């Protein structure tokens, strides 16, 4: 995700990767942190939290590595020569800013402000919600938006819908994450259910945009057909997961 984000931001901004040394160093630190995290989990040092399983000492390493990568990506976006940004840039740039925020916030709440018991689980569920519904989803949508526009030879169809979807997915994807029946105050699962409904509306809007954008790509070289078919398959998976996630929020 990090490498393709750097490539698309550079390509869309019609510039080169700025401060590549930070990106390279951050990538090394990030991979070291991931490796130490897996070793820690396998050696029995897991935290016991579903989304933040890695040991305490690993999370600052991951945050530092991603922060260095983020510096390079932010600088690359700021040095773009094309002032108008595309939906692919919106999604990828936001994902770049979002992961360190939720990772750092969850780390501070659990390990610095000492959230314990159910409160620690609520923070953990909030992190999972943001990591999956905002970071990973935005990276995927950014990649699909870029390649659909590239293969069709035009911008996305329905830019207004794309703006609407972006904000709906960002706002309602960042709250909730608590399943119905969880041992928490009743308003938390209710809030999660409501946010899931609005998130589904945003998912439908961005699916509409990407579906109509890829419909214009009818004349492709043979070398591009497989790649484009893969992007279409990814769009189908996104739609299917969005539907399943929507209905799962109403199941106890």
Name each region found by the language model.
Residues 1-83, 108-117, 173-200:
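Membrane-interface helix-loop-helix modules in multi-pass inner-membrane proteins
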Residues 104-115, 247-251:
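Short, motif-level signal for alpha-helix interfacial/capping segments enriched in acidic residues
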Residues 95-107, 130-136, 140-152, 172-184, ...:
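Catalytic cores of extracellular degradative/oxidative enzymes
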Residues 8-13, 74-80, 146-152, 210-217:
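Structural signal for the C-terminal ends of transmembrane alpha-helices
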């Amino acid at each position: 995700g990090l490498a393709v984000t750097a490539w698309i931001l550079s390509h869309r901004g019609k510039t080169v990767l700025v401060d590549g040394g930070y990106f390279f160093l951050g990538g090394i630190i990030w991979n070291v942190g991931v490796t130490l995290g897996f070793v820690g989990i396998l050696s029995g040092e897991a935290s016991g939290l579903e989304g933040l399983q890695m040991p305490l000492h690993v999370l600052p390493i991951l945050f530092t590595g991603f922060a260095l990568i983020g510096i390079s990506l932010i600088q690359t976006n700021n040095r773009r020569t094309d002032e108008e940004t595309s939906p692919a840039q919106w999604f990828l740039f936001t994902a770049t800013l979002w992961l360190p925020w939720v990772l750092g916030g969850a780390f501070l709440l659990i390990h610095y402000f000492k959230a314990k018991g159910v409160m620690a689980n609520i923070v953990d569920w909030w992190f999972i919600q943001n990591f999956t519904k905002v970071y990973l989803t935005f990276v995927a949508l950014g990649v699909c938006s870029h390649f659909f526009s590239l293969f069709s030879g035009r911008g996305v169809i329905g830019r207004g819908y794309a703006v609407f979807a972006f904000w709906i997915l960002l706002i309602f994807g960042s709250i909730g994450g608590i399943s119905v029946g969880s041992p928490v105050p009743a308003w938390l699962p209710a809030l999660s259910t409501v946010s899931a409904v609005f998130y589904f509306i945003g998912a439908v809007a961005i699916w509409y945009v990407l579906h109509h954008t890829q419909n214009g790509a009818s004349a492709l070289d043979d070398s591009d057909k497989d790649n484009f078919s893969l992007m279409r398959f990814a769009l189908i998976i996104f739609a299917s997961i969005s539907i399943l996630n929507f209905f799962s929020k109403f199941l106890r």
